[in-house]
Curated annotation (Swiss-Prot):
Xref: NCBIfam families: PRK00010.1
UniProt xrefs under PROSITE patterns: RIBOSOMAL_L5
GO molecular function: rRNA binding; structural constituent of ribosome; tRNA binding
The protein's name: Large ribosomal subunit protein uL5
A biological-process GO annotation: translation
Keyword Transmembrane helix annotated: no
Subunit structure: Part of the 50S ribosomal subunit; part of the 5S rRNA/L5/L18/L25 subcomplex. Contacts the 5S rRNA and the P site tRNA. Forms a bridge to the 30S subunit in the 70S ribosome.
Recorded family membership: Belongs to the universal ribosomal protein uL5 family.
Gene expressing this chain: rplE
Annotated organism of origin: Variovorax paradoxus (strain S110)
Keywords: Ribonucleoprotein, Ribosomal protein, RNA-binding, rRNA-binding, tRNA-binding
Any one of the GO CC terms: ribonucleoprotein complex
Protein's UniProt keywords contain Ubl conjugation: no
Domain of life of the native organism: Bacteria
Amino acid sequence: MARLQQHYREKIAKDLTEKFGYKSPMQVPRLTKITLNMGVGEAVADKKVLDNAVADLTKIAGQKPVVTKSKKAIAGFKIRENQPIGCMVTLRGVQMYEFLDRFVTIALPRVRDFRGISGRAFDGRGNYNIGVKEQIIFPEIEYDKVDALRGLNISITTTAKTDEEAKALLAGFRFPFKN
C-alpha cells in the first residue's frame, strides 16, 4: 500500500467525515484517477518529437502512455484527421498514489518561483486541473537528455460533489494551496 493511500485511510477520511458530517464511509470523497496529458503540436512536422514526449511521459508516470489523435482536420493548424498530436496516461490505484506522493513532495518544490498552487482550478464538480510548464521538475527526467521543454496537464479526478470537499481532500494530501 502506498504511503498516501495509508494516510488517506487512517487520517484524511476521518478528518473529512468530521468536517462535513458524512453518515456513510462511502460518502467520503476519494481520488478516482489522475490523468497526465501532453499535447505535442510540433508532432505535425516531426514524428520524433512525439516519440520523445512518449518516452518522457513513460518515465514520469511509470507506465506507457497512449498516443492521442486529432478528431477532425483543422487547416489553420495544418492538422489532418486521425493524425497523432499528443499522448496521455491514466493512473489508478497504487500507481496513482505513488505519483501523487512524488508530485507533491518532490516535483512541485522544484518549480521555479513556486508560491503554491491555485485554489481556483477546480471544475465545479470536485475535480482539479494543474498545468506544469516544464517536464524537468520530475526527478525521473534527466536534464541533459531533454530535447525540448514540454509542459503537461495533470487532471485529478475525485468523487467529491463540491469544490470545497475536493479542496479539503487535496489539502489532506498536503497540496500547497496559495490561500
